[in-house]
């Protein structure tokens, strides 16, 4: 079994290598507050002790463990960047550090956590009424209830403006009747609470957010089977056939695509940090493997080609983390722009996937065995590079900001 890279300082010293420069090239830890460092270490301890031992079996069997949610809730990892209602109230950087540690173990686990935080608690916190916040957020933050976010549709992925799901007001029952379907929805088959976006005729066909609950008539959430990525998390659909939603479940402070896009921007920040956590793990695993592996009478790591790959990996990871830190600080200062988030989401996910592919190559045949973890990270990152805005969609967002011209056509 391959030793985890960041716990192998003793092995490094035994080889006469006193430097741990590769572990934190730009001294990120020194740029954190004491609370942020403490949070990072607590999250790392939980993830390594509780998540890592079960991830391989979860990936092999494509079986989601719902006990993860209350576990994460008890650690304060759910709803972390929000104040009150049972949430920890961390900085945006603190939330990013949590995502980094969870995804260091598995992108699927981080997806589960970040959906609950940014895409379920987030819209209720930012767009909900006080009654909605009091009713839903404490149970979501504790993990007593699981949530999901319904935006993507079978015919509308990168084009949410084409949304077909409809909300029709029924004056007789004083409810909205929701009809339509959402797909590729993380957590949906096990969710108790669903934040769903639909076009509302009562609001001039504008997009509005609704809180749905398990057990509502006409609501089903079938699981999507056969995934080759994010197998430790659960993904499904939301099917709605005249689902009656009471008026008090309408999110009052969200209108148009700015509602779901605001949620996605918060999620993308966590994804940017998380993807680099997976990249770091691949880098450390490949580094340790090539130090331990003897070929041609010397460590594989002594070959120039291996050192070039590791230099490239360390450079991209270190620069990426600095970008994540800066954009997160800007968000905490109320200065962040959505295009800045697009830069780090696009960069982190694209570079993390490149790092994982290089690391897989460095392990040769062993790179495809789940015992060594890298192949799992690699296929997970294929999805992470796709959701919450694909690599190319974020290029179009940035291109529009650069030129003032809309390339979405």
From Swiss-Prot:
InterPro entries: Acyl-CoA_DH_CS, Acyl-CoA_Oxase/DH_mid-dom, Acyl-CoA_Oxase/DH_mid-dom_sf, AcylCo_DH-like_C, AcylCo_DH/oxidase_C, AcylCoA_DH/ox_N, AcylCoA_DH/ox_N_sf, AcylCoA_DH/oxidase_NM_dom_sf. Its cofactor is FAD. GO terms for biological process: fatty acid beta-oxidation using acyl-CoA dehydrogenase; fatty-acyl-CoA biosynthetic process; L-tryptophan metabolic process. Its EC number is 1.3.8.6. The active site is at 388 (proton acceptor). Coiled coil: none annotated. The keyword Repressor does not apply. One of its GO terms (cellular component) is mitochondrial matrix. Pathway: Amino-acid metabolism; lysine degradation; Amino-acid metabolism; tryptophan metabolism. FAD binds at residues 149-152, 158, 184-186, 390, 408. Keywords: FAD, Flavoprotein, Mitochondrion, Oxidoreductase, Transit peptide. It holds the Pfam family Acyl-CoA_dh_N. It is an enzyme of class 1 (oxidoreductase). It comes from the Eukaryota. It is found in: Mitochondrion matrix. GO terms for molecular function: fatty-acyl-CoA binding; flavin adenine dinucleotide binding; glutaryl-CoA dehydrogenase activity. It catalyses: glutaryl-CoA + oxidized [electron-transfer flavoprotein] + 2 H(+) = (2E)-butenoyl-CoA + reduced [electron-transfer flavoprotein] + CO2. Substrate binds at residues 110-111, 158, 261-265, 268. Belongs to the acyl-CoA dehydrogenase family. This is Probable glutaryl-CoA dehydrogenase, mitochondrial.
């Amino acid at each position: 079994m391959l030793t985890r890279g960041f716990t192998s300082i003793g092995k490094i010293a035994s080889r006469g290598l006193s430097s741990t420069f590769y572990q934190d090239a730009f001294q990120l830890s020194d740029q954190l507050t004491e609370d942020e460092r403490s949070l990072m270490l607590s999250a790392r301890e939980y993830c390594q002790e509780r998540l890592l031992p079960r991830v391989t079996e979860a990936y092999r069997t494509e079986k989601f463990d719902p006990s993860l949610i209350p576990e994460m809730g008890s650690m304060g990892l759910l709803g972390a960047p929000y104040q009150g209602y049972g949430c920890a109230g961390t900085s945006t950087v603190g939330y990013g550090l949590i995502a980094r540690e969870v995804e260091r173990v598995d992108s699927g686990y981080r997806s589960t956590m970040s959906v609950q935080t940014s895409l379920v608690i987030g819209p209720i916190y930012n767009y909900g009424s006080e009654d909605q916040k009091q009713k839903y957020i404490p149970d979501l933050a504790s993990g007593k209830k699981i949530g999901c976010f319904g935006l993507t549709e079978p015919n509308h992925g990168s084009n949410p403006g084409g949304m077909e799901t409809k909300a029709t007001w029924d004056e007789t029952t004083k409810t909205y009747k929701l009809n339509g379907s959402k797909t590729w929805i993380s957590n949906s088959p096990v969710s108790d609470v669903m934040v769903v976006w639909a076009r509302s005729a009562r609001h001039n066909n504008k997009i509005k957010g609704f809180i749905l609950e398990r057990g509502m008539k006409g609501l089903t959430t079938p699981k999507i089977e056969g995934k080759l990525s994010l197998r430790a998390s659960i993904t499904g659909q939301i099917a709605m056939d005249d689902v009656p939603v009471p008026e008090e479940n309408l999110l009052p402070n969200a209108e148009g695509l700015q509602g779901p896009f605001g949620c996605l921007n918060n999620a993308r920040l966590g994804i940017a940090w998380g993807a680099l956590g997976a990249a770091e793990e691949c880098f450390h695993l490949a580094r340790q493997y090539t130090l331990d592996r003897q070929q041609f009478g010397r460590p594989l790591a002594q070959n120039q080609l291996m050192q070039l790959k590791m230099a490239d990996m360390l450079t991209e990871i270190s620069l990426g983390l600095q970008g994540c830190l800066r954009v997160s600080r800007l968000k905490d200062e109320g200065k962040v722009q959505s295009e800045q988030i697009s830069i780090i989401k696009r960069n982190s996910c694209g570079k993390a996937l490149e790092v994982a592919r290089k690391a897989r190559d460095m392990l040769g045949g062993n790179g495809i065995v789940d015992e060594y973890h890298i192949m799992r990270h690699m296929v997970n990152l294929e999805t992470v590079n796709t959701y919450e805005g694909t690599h190319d969609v974020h290029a179009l967002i940035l291109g529009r900001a650069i030129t003032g011209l809309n390339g979405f056509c």
